[in-house]
């Protein structure tokens, strides 16, 4: 956690903007559409990451995945909760659908994919340089570091987003239960990272995944910031 806190992602201007800037309805829609795009991709990557974990490490991921998908109740999926925040803020369904995903957010998605799922046949196709860098590292440990970075940053993201949506009197919307949920998930992800650090001494691999996602988050935050600065 201390390692991650020292990274520039934690002090990205996005967080100040979310806490202080006036956000229009259109900006709120663009912001949430882009957050939706990144979160939807990460949910799928979590499922992939679970498939390369040792049996004894899978449990650290399952609760997170199940919660994201509404604990088995389709209407409680987190994606639907996010979209309801947008609609409750006054964004029309037509406008929400029409908003584009920022180039920087697409760069984030492309960058984090091999960190969550760093198997040879994937990285050889999509990230050959990554394959060379990680040839001697535990692929599951890289994914563990990536997941840990995501969950640590998610806590900060939701705290700032909750403040931003006070402007729409939506700070108590169920989607912002994520502030507590992500605190719990960050504990699970840190436990996952510690599993590889203590049982497999995979420090270099965990750090590679952790740092890689933190670096990628700069692209994500650049894209999200652009949506509220237009």
Feature map (PLM): residue ranges:
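Non-heme di-metal
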Residues: 1-230
């Amino acid at each position: 956690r201390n390692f991650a806190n020292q990274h520039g992602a934690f002090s990205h201007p996005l967080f100040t903007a979310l806490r202080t800037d006036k956000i229009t309805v259109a900006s709120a829609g663009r912001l949430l559409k882009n957050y939706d795009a990144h979160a939807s991709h990460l949910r799928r990557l979590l499922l992939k990451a679970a498939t390369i974990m040792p049996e004894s490490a899978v449990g650290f991921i399952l609760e997170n995945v199940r919660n994201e998908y509404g604990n088995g109740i389709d209407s409680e999926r987190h994606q639907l909760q996010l979209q309801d925040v947008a609609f409750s803020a006054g964004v029309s369904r037509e406008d929400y659908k029409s908003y584009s995903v920022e180039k920087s957010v697409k760069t984030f998605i492309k960058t984090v994919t091999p960190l969550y799922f760093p198997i040879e046949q994937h990285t050889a196709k999509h990230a050959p340089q990554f394959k060379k860098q990680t040839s001697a590292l535990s692929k599951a440990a890289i994914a563990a570091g990536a997941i840990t970075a995501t969950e640590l940053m998610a806590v900060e993201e939701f705290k700032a987003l909750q403040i931003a949506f006070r402007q729409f009197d939506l700070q108590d919307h169920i989607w912002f239960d994520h502030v507590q949920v992500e605190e719990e998930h960050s504990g699970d992800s840190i436990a996952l990272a510690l599993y590889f650090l203590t049982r497999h001494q995979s420090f270099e691999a965990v750090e590679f995944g952790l740092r890689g996602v933190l670096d990628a988050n700069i692209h994500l935050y650049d894209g999200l910031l652009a949506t509220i600065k237009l």
